[in-house]
Amino acid sequence: MALPPNFMPLFRASLIGLGLGCSALALAASAQDAPEAETQAQETQGQAAARAAAADLAAGQDDEPRILEAPAPDARRVYVNDPAHFAAVTQQFVIDGEAGRVIGMIDGGFLPNPVVADDGSFIAHASTVFSRIARGERTDYVEVFDPVTLLPTADIELPDAPRFLVGTYPWMTSLTPDGKTLLFYQFSPAPAVGVVDLEGKAFKRMLDVPDCYHIFPTAPDTFFMHCRDGSLAKVAFGTEGTPEITHTEVFHPEDEFLINHPAYSQKAGRLVWPTYTGKIHQIDLSSGDAKFLPAVEALTEAERADGWRPGGWQQVAYHRALDRIYLLVDQRDEWRHKTASRLLVVLDAKTGERLAKFEMGHEIDSINVSQDEKPLLYALSTGDKTLYIHDAESGEELRSVNQLGHGPQVITTADMG
């Protein structure tokens, strides 16, 4: 359900339904007594919306709730997934990155994995619910949403509860480039990839795969996975039969650890995958085969010796048109690679040249970039429950969106640039 820009109808409905008219009047009176500048400096966005709604109630204005539609999606729409620290019921916030405001929310179950079509035409997630909220019979499902009404257009149950419930890992659930098929990962009882026909609104089958992880689609019937031996597996599948699986060369040794959340541009066919030390592997998958590009170093030898390492949850982002890599870094002890970072480096993906190093001003866990000509850099602080929106060229913080649930972790954008 789409929300109005300032949430006023929802506040009005809540206040009326709970019989809090007197409280609303008192809130309005209190707000009027306080100096405007002081009130605005101290209150959150939610408090400001409540104050405005209470003032409208006191004036007898428009006290009927309304259901609004969100604006049509554009390249600057951003989705923030809040798994709420492994809660059974979760939310995804739909945000207008240009205006810096929440325009809607989508409910999910336990550890949903969101995806969005490159043209912005739909949002989907693979999710899990239980018959008694946090316990009982488990049901896995895929849900598809309209990007304007934010109402579900498909609800597809997955047989035998096959989803891999380990965390909100991007690229454990993926869309094929044509947006017609959703692929999801199964870990137990054996590695497999599930195939869901979004057009037909039906689960199709499970594909047996090697002991490999992540799903990087390159065609409607082909995807790559990363394997334990340091190679990529290419998986070609049809409507039936055994998938055809081939392996690439080993591109990194087993003791050179890659972060859990790489960046992948389907339109460019570019996979960007940093190591724990800041070495960045790049693989060109645009031809349908894997071409390994020269690795680049995000950090200097002196910085690495001084304890600088990548860190965060969603640590790396890639801008297709500019061919730039964005990576969160900070000084940290070894094995602290999932802790938040205070700085970000920008690299030319082709040459490895460092173009910028930004002080983010906050402890940042996850990043992403809009794919338009003058991109926005999205920086999410799980601790602050806030999305900070920066100019990706200068690093300047432009605006922020706060009160994003309990523990927001993952930023998803559409490549509409």
UniProtKB/Swiss-Prot annotation:
Chemical reaction(s) catalysed: 2 oxidized [amicyanin] + methylamine + H2O = 2 reduced [amicyanin] + formaldehyde + NH4(+) + 2 H(+)
Localization: Periplasm
E.C. no: 1.4.9.1
Disulfide bonds: 212-227
Domain of life (superkingdom): Bacteria
Keywords assigned: Disulfide bond, Electron transport, Oxidoreductase, Periplasm, Signal, Transport
GO process annotations (BP): methylamine metabolic process
Keyword Disulfide bond: yes
Broad enzyme group: oxidoreductase
Leader peptide range in chain numbering: 1-28
Keyword Hydrolase (UniProt): no
Major place of residence: periplasm
This protein's GO CC annotations: periplasmic space
Record GO terms (molecular function): aliphatic amine dehydrogenase activity; methylamine dehydrogenase (amicyanin) activity
Quaternary structure and partners: Tetramer of two light and two heavy chains.
Task performed by this protein: Methylamine dehydrogenase carries out the oxidation of methylamine. Electrons are passed from methylamine dehydrogenase to amicyanin.
Similarity annotation: Belongs to the aromatic amine dehydrogenase heavy chain family.
Protein name as annotated: Methylamine dehydrogenase heavy chain
Organism ancestry: Bacteria, Pseudomonadati, Pseudomonadota, Alphaproteobacteria, Rhodobacterales
